[in-house]
Amino acid sequence: MRLMILLALLLVSGSLSAQTQGAIKRVCHVARFELAVACIKKYEGLHGPKHHPYVGYGHKLLPGEKFSPRMTERQADALLRSDLRKLCAMFRDFGRDSLLLATLAYNVGCGKVMKSRIMV
């Protein structure tokens, strides 16, 4: 956390080259993405066979998908990251808020986020 604050202060100060600033922004984005993944894992938990049609860390099976309800943590992690990246891309037009909206959509569903008052 202290590192992110330091990086943010350096960005604001303008004392870094554009290339360095771009690298810092990428690092901060990765850190936020990892934090979102950790939060989803903590609050969703790893779903087992009794949670059908949900597998992994809350992935809802779509028609034609053949994911096992007994997937490993590594497989579940990869599926979560893939889903979250797709949702981030869906909300890309919202800039810095795309990860926040993607995390919310992962939890409540994309349709509910799009119909929500927060999107007005």
Predicted segments with their positions:
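Cell-wall polysaccharide-cleaving catalytic domain and substrate-binding groove, primarily
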Residues: 3-120
